[in-house]
Amino acid sequence: MNHDDPNASGVPHDDANDAAPASASDAARATGHADDESSPLHLRRIRSFVTRAGRVSTGQRRAIDELGPRFVVPYDNAQPDWDTVFGRRAPRVLEIGFGMGASTAEIAAHRPGDDFIGVEVHEPGVGALLKLIGEQQLSNIRIIQHDAVEVLEHMIAPDSLDGAHIFFPDPWHKARHHKRRLIQPPFVAQLAARLKPGAYLHCATDWQNYAEQMLEVLGADPSLENTAQDYAPRPDYRPVTKFERRGLRLGHGVWDLVFRKKRAG
């Protein structure tokens, strides 16, 4: 879940039903099979969200109706021609779980030469980002309202992304829920395969335990290398959200991790 809206659904991170398959940017996809991480089905059980109800405002609904046909790319089991979708060839960045979209819009506005694919399942967030796209006249964002794991599998070609952002995914802070976190070895391997050599993966979290897990998992992937000794300074392009600023005032930490895909040789 992106910190644009720390709890847009009204459900705290771990207060959702324990049987729920996942979270707004994390977790394990239930299939009815045994929970065996060595199984080839394990990656398919990873899901990037848990279904939560959320009210779509009048303005968000209007943005969906008016701007959705241009800026929302329907999920498909085939890879679109992204150059055609954006109307140009430019560096392409994937953001998984953009929340209410404020950070996504701000980054896109400051990086007009890059194109951004935002993946979010929750309709209020989709509507909120579309509203910002309209207000700020942004042309370099497209949205897919679907599970990020399936989007990666079917809609993003290997070695095609110049960057990926995963900001403040749900931490699932209870130990019994850690298996639901998004940043797990199978998912990271899948995402890394979609990055071009030299492309970056930027994760951020305000949960130290999750930051430690991210550092371990990302560091163990043989195709990735850390750009820092451990945690990275916050890159200038990532905005500090109101929620994050409040946490920092209260003494809470925020950890950024920036890895790059290794080049051949």
Curated annotation (Swiss-Prot):
One of its GO terms (cellular component) is tRNA methyltransferase complex. NCBIfam families: tRNA (guanosine(46)-N7)-methyltransferase TrmB (TIGR00091). Residues 1-16 have a biased composition (Basic and acidic residues). Its EC number is 2.1.1.33. The active site is at 170. Belongs to the class I-like SAM-binding methyltransferase superfamily. TrmB family. It comes from the Bacteria. Residues 1-40 are annotated as: Disordered. The keyword S-adenosyl-L-methionine applies. S-adenosyl-L-methionine binds at residues 95, 120, 147, 170. This is tRNA (guanine-N(7)-)-methyltransferase. Residues 18-31 have a biased composition (Low complexity).
